[in-house]
Each structure stands twice: as structure tokens, then as C-alpha cells.
């Protein structure tokens, strides 16, 4: 899972991830947007589920984050749409709408993100 933290001309932080993990970057850009309190909340929740069978979720406007003792899932809320709502022959391209990664790797990303936005 490769990623980079960037700043645009206005100074806003943008996060880009490698193929297969793009949704984590979209989630950080759309749902977190540099909110350190939200990062604290997620890291506290991760500590609470680490090594257990418990799960935790953080629904957002565009994406929902799920944590369990070993794994993280970021999923676009649009994937909750019922297939009956679509025209016949149409389907969603969801490669950039769902991602799984290890909890420890995800926490390293959040640590790097926090360091980048506070520098």
C-alpha cells in the first residue's frame, strides 16, 4: 500500500494512494479533512477493538469506516444502493469504492497523515 501526502496551491492537504487502496485517500480527503479530533476518536476506537472480536464503525457523508481487531474496511456509502434502483444492464464500478487493509498499517497511515498536516 503506497501513498503520498501533498498540498495543493491553497495549502489544502491531499492524499493519494496506490491502486487498490485509493478509497482510503478519498476517505481522508472527504471525511477527515485534517480534523485532529476525528483522528483522535478513530485511534481511540482502534485501541478499543485491537486484539478483540469487537467492531466499530464511523459512518460519514460519503464513506463509512469499519474497524475490527485486525482489519479496516473503508467503503463508499453509495455501495448500499439497491441494485433494483439501477437501469437494466448498468452496474457500479466499485474498485475505488471499497478497500480492506490491516489495522496496524492503517494506524501507520493515520500517524503519517497527522504528522504531515501538523508540520
UniProtKB/Swiss-Prot annotation:
Annotated source species: Yersinia pestis
HAMAP family (alphabetical): UPF0231 (MF_01053)
Membership in a protein family: Belongs to the UPF0231 family.
The protein, known as: UPF0231 protein YPO3414/y0772/YP_0271
Pfam families membership: UPF0231
Amino acid at each position: 500500500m503506497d501513498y503520498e501526502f501533498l498540498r495543493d496551491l491553497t495549502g489544502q492537504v491531499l492524499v493519494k494512494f496506490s491502486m487498490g487502496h485509493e478509497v482510503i485517500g478519498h476517505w481522508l480527503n472527504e471525511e477527515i479533512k485534517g480534523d485532529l479530533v476525528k483522528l483522535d476518536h478513530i485511534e481511540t476506537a482502534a485501541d478499543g477493538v485491537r486484539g478483540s472480536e469487537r467492531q466499530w464503525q464511523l459512518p460519514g457523508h460519503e464513506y463509512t469506516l469499519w474497524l475490527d481487531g485486525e482489519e479496516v474496511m473503508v467503503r463508499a456509502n453509495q455501495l448500499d444502493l439497491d441494485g433494483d434502483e439501477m437501469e437494466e444492464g448498468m452496474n457500479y464500478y466499485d474498485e475505488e469504492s471499497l478497500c480492506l487493509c490491516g489495522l496496524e498499517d492503517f494506524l501507520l497511515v493515520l500517524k503519517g497523515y497527522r504528522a504531515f498536516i501538523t508540520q
